[in-house]
């Protein structure tokens, strides 16, 4: 089967949708499907080391949902997309965030075959969907298969575009993230518990809450350290804040390679995801769980879909540094609980392995192809 995966977001900048598309493509190729990835990039001539990647347009930053998305907006998109579709004759085109302007909308308008859309996002509201509904509905109804990565994502998109959505979660490569990865020696110290954060340095990811909680925790005990992985517009401010407050044993690693990241997870004793909202799912939670690391995460809908409090970790109210400090203190003090939660996380992560997830996606592809064929037959008859 010839499949085209369409992403609206710049592949230079790491994010959940881009990672989802990369791993989906890998698993589809492993099953002998022919895969093309269509996405913008701010680097000309860079295939990002991905077979079948086609750069379509240069991205521009657009702010939304407490973050900055980089999407392609160009008058040349129509010509380039039409040429690709005519040349390749895909069996299925799979759009990730299909109603985002740029590459998805353009491709959806032009493709005459089976179209599948995955909706990843959730937020309190989306003014673009609200005011653009009369126009966007025309494109939405061109989709023959509808996927959401979680129940919160389904509830969010259904407010604007009701439909028969299938929930197929994000996946995890459990051969890549696993407890027996070699640790990074520099992140381990005898008698110290390593607390880990992985994410973009932006306000909604909640690192400020974690830094406050960690400062409180250090006043209670000296046997902890904090490791922060990721980059973004607020990194400098966070680093300066730690220096100014004199908070000890905080290490900012910045962006790390995909080869090193699994080893960093395996080096941690506790993983923290303090996001304040705007999360439909927690891919980083799965990465930590598959690595055998107990999770402390915000009690928000997207995260509670992944972690059961008391089983794979603890769920804590967002934006509450005192509650976070208490939760961290509890786990640091209880090595047996950490081990039990880590083992439970490994078991649960197996159900999110890409091999399982892609079975569900291929089922949607088959149904979408049947619907598209029936529509074409009805139109020609």
Each PLM stretch: what is its role?
Residues 309-310, 314-321, 330-335:
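Conserved acidic donor-binding segment of nucleotide-sugar-dependent glycosyltransferases
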Residues 41, 152, 171:
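Carbohydrate-associated surface elements
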Residues 255-256, 263-268, 361:
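Short alpha-helical donor nucleotide-sugar binding micro-motif in glycosyltransferases
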Residues 239-256:
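Nucleotide-activated donor-binding/catalytic signature segment of Leloir-type glycosyltransferases, i.e.
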Residues 294-297:
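Short hydrophobic beta-strand element within catalytic cores of glycosyltransferases
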Residues 127, 155, 172-187, 263:
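Acidic anion/phosphate-binding donor-loop and adjacent secondary structure
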Residues 4, 187-214, 227:
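Conserved donor-binding/catalytic core segment of Leloir-type glycosyltransferases
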Residues 7-14, 22, 26-75:
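N-terminal strand-loop element at the rim of the active site
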């Amino acid at each position: 089967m010839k499949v085209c995966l369409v992403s609206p977001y710049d592949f230079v900048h790491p994010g959940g949708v881009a990672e989802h598309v990369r791993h989906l493509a890998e698993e589809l190729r492993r099953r002998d499907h022919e895969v093309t990835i269509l996405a913008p990039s701010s680097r000309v001539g860079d295939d990002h080391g991905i077979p079948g990647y086609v750069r379509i347009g240069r991205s521009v930053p657009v702010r939304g949902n407490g973050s900055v998305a980089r999407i392609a907006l160009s008058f040349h998109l129509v010509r380039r997309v039409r040429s690709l579709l005519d040349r390749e004759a895909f069996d299925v085109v799979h759009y990730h965030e299909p109603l985002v302007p740029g590459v998805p909308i353009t491709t959806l308008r032009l493709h005459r075959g089976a179209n599948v859309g995955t909706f990843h996002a959730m937020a309190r509201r989306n003014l673009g969907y609200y005011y653009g509904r009369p126009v966007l509905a025309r494109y939405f109804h061109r989709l023959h298969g509808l996927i959401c990565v979680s129940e919160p994502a389904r509830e969010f998109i259904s407010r604007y575009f009701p439909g028969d959505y299938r929930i197929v979660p994000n996946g995890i490569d459990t051969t890549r993230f696993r407890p027996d990865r070699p640790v990074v020696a520099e992140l381990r110290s005898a008698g110290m518990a390593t607390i880990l954060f992985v994410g973009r340095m932006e306000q909604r990811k909640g690192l400020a809450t974690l830094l406050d909680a960690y400062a409180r925790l250090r006043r209670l005990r000296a046997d902890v350290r904090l490791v922060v992985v990721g980059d973004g517009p607020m990194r400098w401010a966070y680093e300066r804040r730690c220096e100014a407050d004199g908070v000890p044993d905080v290490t900012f690693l910045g962006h790390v390679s995909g080869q090193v990241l699994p080893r960093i997870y395996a080096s941690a004793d506790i993983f923290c995801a303090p996001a304040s909202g705007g999360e439909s799912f927690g891919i980083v939670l799965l990465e930590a769980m598959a690595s055998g690391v107990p999770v402390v995460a915000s009690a928000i809908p997207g995260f509670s879909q992944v972690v059961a409090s008391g089983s794979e970790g603890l769920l804590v109210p967002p934006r509450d540094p005192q509650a976070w400090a208490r939760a961290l203190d509890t786990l640091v003090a209880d090595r047996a609980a950490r081990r039990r939660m880590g083992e439970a996380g490994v078991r649960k992560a197996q159900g999110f392995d890409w091999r399982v997830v892609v079975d569900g996606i291929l089922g949607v592809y088959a149904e979408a192809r049947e619907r598209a064929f029936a529509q074409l037959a009805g139109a020609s008859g």
